[in-house]
Amino acid sequence: MLRRSKEERTLKENLLLASSTALAAGITNVAGMIAFLAFTTNVTGHVANLAKHIVEQNYRDIIVFLVWLLLFFAGAFLSSFIIRSYKHTSDYKAHSIPVVIEIIVLLFVAIYGHNFYSETALEREVVIGSIMFAMGLQNSLVSTVSGGLIKTSHLTGLFTDLGGDIAEWFHPKARKTVTVRDKIYVRLTILGFYLAGAIVGGLLFDLIDFAIFYIVPVILLVILYYDLTIIKLRKLKRRIDQ
């Protein structure tokens, strides 16, 4: 899922990356909403709330929303910076480092929320900020790896792109190319798995509370392990062939 980027990627690799990261984003967003009463991937909504607080001159809330937005931006910036820095050595290494950082951040959220969270305003703001940083990392990573095709938490853009792709597919004067078909498959996969993750997040939070945040790092570890398994199998095959 992380070994190749952009045009080198197969449909299978894009579908696997889209489904796993969209599932993780859906779980995180809904669990964050239930736990902290804030959508942790809804940057558009946070900008709207920021504008509202500016109008109402709620200075503390203005600072909070600015920090949240900056943390999402920081996650996206860091992810892209790391990928560009390590791209010349190994695609897998360049793409896996942001995932490892995301796992660490979400484990912090899971451990703190499950064991120490006492529902104070400051704790809530710090945890939401941490999740937004992690989602910035993930969004930037999958977008960069897929050449902008996959954005697992940006559903407004997803519906816009999906509408355009389906219009192109059904238009009588447009060619029904494999590229357009594959884009539709990927976008529908993101939508379906994000919705599934959101449903799972809502149901499981009632049962296991903050322990649900342990599930997302497990999904991300599976993404890392999937590519490591393929790399090991290829090395084994080369040894056998020799």
What are the functions of these language-model segments?
Residues 2-242:
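Alpha-helical transmembrane segments of multi-pass membrane proteins
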